[in-house]
């Protein structure tokens, strides 16, 4: 059991029989009434995001998540195939379960697969990934001083806002937490 006062980003908890990851949290102490913790949680089985409020000091179960290092191999229709790097065992995950993560996955990329009581519940991405720009408007000379941005489509289909100096074929570093441009690789 863990107190909601000890929440931190990335913590996995079990509430109402479901496994949740804490995305955001805020301790609120109103002038009148009891303190509470407002949180934004992601269901690791379904990918659904829910905002939930807990009373300060309330206890929840901490979910013990095991991780296995695996390599993303390929998509087979609606299923995505991963291989354990040590045992060469392959598992398949439905696209619906890893919908967000698919924006960042490339073939042969190493990731951690999250397991809860033997059940595969999701993919843990690295903090950043390198992705190649496949489509963007050409930068206009002299535009770099304005500090604006333009959309760029990456090799996985993800569209991000990038500075004007980024061109097709450039490799970019993308933050997987929010899908934003960090820098050129």
From Swiss-Prot:
- Does the keyword Cytoplasm feature in the UniProt annotation? yes
Instruction: Indicate where this protein resides in the cell.
Output: Cytoplasm
Pathway entry: Protein biosynthesis; polypeptide chain elongation
Does Cytoplasm count among this protein's keywords?
yes
Sorted UniProt keywords: Cytoplasm, Elongation factor, Protein biosynthesis
Which family does the UniProt entry place this protein in?
Belongs to the elongation factor P family.
Q: What is this protein called?
A: Elongation factor P
Which source organism does the UniProt entry give?
Answer: Geobacillus thermodenitrificans (strain NG80-2)
């Amino acid at each position: 059991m863990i107190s909601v006062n000890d929440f931190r980003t990335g913590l996995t908890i079990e509430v109402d029989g479901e496994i949740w990851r804490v995305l955001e949290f805020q301790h609120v102490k109103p002038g009148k009434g009891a303190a509470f913790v407002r949180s934004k949680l992601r269901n690791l089985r379904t990918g659904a995001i829910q905002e939930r409020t807990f009373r300060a000091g309330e206890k929840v179960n901490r979910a013990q998540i095991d991780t296995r290092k695996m390599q993303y191999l390929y998509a087979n229709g609606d299923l995505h195939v991963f291989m354990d790097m040590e045992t060469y065992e392959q598992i398949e995950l439905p696209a619906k379960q890893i919908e967000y993560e698919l924006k960042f996955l490339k073939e042969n990329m190493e990731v951690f697969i999250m397991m809860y009581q033997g059940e595969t519940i999701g993919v843990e991405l690295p903090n950043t990934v390198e992705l190649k720009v496949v489509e963007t408007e050409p930068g206009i000379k002299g535009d770099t001083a304005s500090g604006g941005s333009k959309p760029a489509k990456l090799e996985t289909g993800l569209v991000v806002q990038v500075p004007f100096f980024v061109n097709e074929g450039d490799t970019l570093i993308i933050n997987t937490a929010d899908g934003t441009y960090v820098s050129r690789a």
